[in-house]
Amino acid sequence: MIDTNIVLDLLLFKDPATQAFKQALASAKIQWLSTQAMRDELERVLGYPKIMARMAVAEMGADKVLQQFDTQALLVDVAPKASVTCRDPDDQKFIDLAVLHKATLLSKDRAVLCMKKRLLALSVRAQTAMDFEP
């Protein structure tokens, strides 16, 4: 699983830190789980002026980013609230889904990464894209 910032790094910014995730996804070693709420958040963020400017430079519209999301992410049902709570309410949906599926969660959000130990106790690895190994 990847949060919205990592989605942007993967699909728009082509950040080299996401390369291992991209390769694992392409080779079907992993599956990218997401929800409609996560897709909706991405769509909203793509409307931010700074992101729109980056899309213009990359000659990529929001529709193209969303199309890539739709072809790579598997939409699943929203997860119930996990037993751990993130300081940032916007990140809770990622925590909940990762806990339900005992998944690796890639993020660069401090509010998520500071939960590493608590999440590991629930069989969830929270880490940066740079640290990802399939």
Locate each region found by the language model.
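Alpha-helix capping/helix-boundary segments
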Residues: 6-7, 38, 111-112
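Residues at secondary-structure transition points
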Residues: 16, 33, 60, 85, ...
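Residues that scaffold the ATP/ADP-binding catalytic core of kinase and kinase-like folds
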Residues: 9-11, 45, 54, 115-116
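PIN-domain endoribonuclease scaffold, especially VapC-family toxins
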Residues: 24-29, 33-81
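Short, flexible loop segments at the rims of nucleotide/cofactor-binding pockets, characterized by
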Residues: 8-10, 55, 80-87
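Acidic, PIN/NYN-like endoribonuclease modules and their adjacent C-terminal/linker elements
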Residues: 85, 92-95, 99-106, 110-134
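Short, well-structured N-terminal submotif of metal-dependent ribonuclease cores
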Residues: 1-34
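Short amphipathic alpha-helical segments and helix-helix/interface helices
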Residues: 21-22, 66, 94-95
